[in-house]
Amino acid sequence: MSSRSSARPGRPAPSRWVRRRRSAIHGSGLIAARPIPAGTRIIEYVGERITKAEADRREQVRLAQRGAGRDGCVYVFELNKRHDIDGDVPWNPARLINHSCDANCEPEVIRGRIWIIALRDIAAGEELGYDYGFDLADWREHPCLCGTAVCPGYIVKKSQRWRVRRLLAGENRSAAG
């Protein structure tokens, strides 16, 4: 059983704060259309409400597609203990927000809806990016292209980046020796 979140099919969730643009990080992204103050609810992350089991199934299908040379991006967000939101729908421009190791926004569940919130003031023209928070287990499968000074080269949650740096340093020492 699934249901739609607040935006209607075929209509993007309106946001006066962002515009879609080509991204230096990956494909398309969202940029600030005007200055965004810290704490602003920038845009709602919308899509199909699905069970955890269905979310797991879709994730496996999309990861298999990536292995077959297709997009394979996963746009599933945790909503609560029973349901997730699959944002892989055309009316969800928030799905275009790329990962950044130096995030300027973050997702937050507020009254059963997922909002992207500004962590700091964001300048007009600046690309939005949040920490995807991937676990360390499959870190090699998620190279990071954000290019920030704090980026270890792979998408992992902030608390695990030091581990990736240590693993890479050990590999570099082994290769040099």
Predicted regions mapped to residue ranges:
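Protein maturation boundaries and topogenic segments
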Residues: M1, A7, R11-P12
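Catalytic cores of histone-lysine modification enzymes
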Residues: G10-E108
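C-terminal SET catalytic tail plus cysteine-rich post-SET Zn-binding segment of SAM-dependent SET-domain
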Residues: S100-G177
